[in-house]
UniProtKB/Swiss-Prot annotation:
Top-level taxon of origin: Eukaryota
PANTHER family named among the record's database cross-references: LYMPHOCYTE EXPANSION MOLECULE
Source organism (scientific name): Mus musculus (Mouse)
Protein name, as recorded: Ciliary microtubule-associated protein 2
Lineage, opening ranks: Eukaryota, Metazoa, Chordata, Craniata, Vertebrata
Gene from which the chain derives: Cimap2
Transmembrane segments: none
Matching Pfam families: SHIPPO-rpt
Amino acid sequence: MRPRTHGAPPRNIMSTIPKWFKGAPFGVQSHRFDVSAVYPNQKKFSTFTEAPYSRHHSVELSHIGPGTYNSKDTCFSKKFLEQKLGSGWSQAHEATRLTQLPHFHYQAIKKEKEQQVHKRGPGSYNIKDFITELQKKPQSKRGLLSSGETRFRGFIGNYYPGPGNYGEKGNPYTQLEEKAWNRSHSDGLMCRVSNKPPLFHQGSGLGPGTYTIKSDLETFVKKSTGNRGPYDIFSGERSSPLPYGHYSVQKMKPKELTDYKSFLDEMNSQHKKKQGVFSKYPRDPKHPTERIFWTTLSQCPKNMDIAGPGSWLPHETEQKHVNRPPFLLASKRCGLKAYQMILGTWNPVGVGRYLNTTLMESIDRRQRYRSLYMSEPKRYLQDLTRDRLMQKRITPITKGKCRPTVDYNSDPTP
């Protein structure tokens, strides 16, 4: 017989463990836990596992079922009551602590409030920036580089087709020739005249003796009139209550059911008319709705119809009519210098040709001293002798003289 190798599972361990029950309580006599779970090759399907080689887990905890409980160790047993009586103060302390605790739904809120009270200072606040706030708002599905536009479109804007691309089969004059030909040959002279309107029907078409004309008297007699007579004040019976006047009796309105609005009337009302209606705005707009996203070219593309670099609109300039000089020279053909050299006269006679054009009335004839024009202005401290002399001229007369002071508040001297 081959000896068993080390680590092989025991083959008769299931038969050696005693049973704690009689019969089959759950319809099966096999054990609830399979010890061979440690060895995958020996594991049975749909069986529970347990900690192997442990009598505490395998016997006391795993074999639980009807008839296996000890009725003596209940909550009313002496052993259980002695344990509870011994720790009465600790239970009272624990109960007091539990009453001070908030409900488990509000524990997170209370903890957050306590942190706000104790943690106050720089760096302890969670202030959200504008980027985080913008991320919470409904935004566009596009990314930073996706414009939502077709990558390759047809030529637009500054594209002009070349020769041979206009008109039918590349000839732009084909349509004009066809119109000229049809206008002069296809329509006749009478075809251009507009249709005349149909004549009106004269008469009703009824023969003599087929209709009757009612007279004015018959029409007046058949006219609907009231049933009251000349002496009838109120219509109806005399015994009925008076509906009008001072002695009238108020009519009671018939009892009617309350007029509730139907579901259709309520949905068509002014406040609920737009509910459930598709919006007219596009889901993916061409330009984003928020101005902060207008900075990037991918989210706010430029209009392709606008002329780009290399194209411009010429400015319309006003053409002014200017009389050009005969030989493109602005100078006079015969100036004053040339006239003096040719004729030899230095004082030509004529209108505007006088050299001395000063008016006699504007000449200043006042006589002045010659020394005024020969003197030069001198600065202060340039000539000390002259400065000392000039200082004496402006010296006041009362310099060095002290006038007697008179006190007008005191009594006059006798």
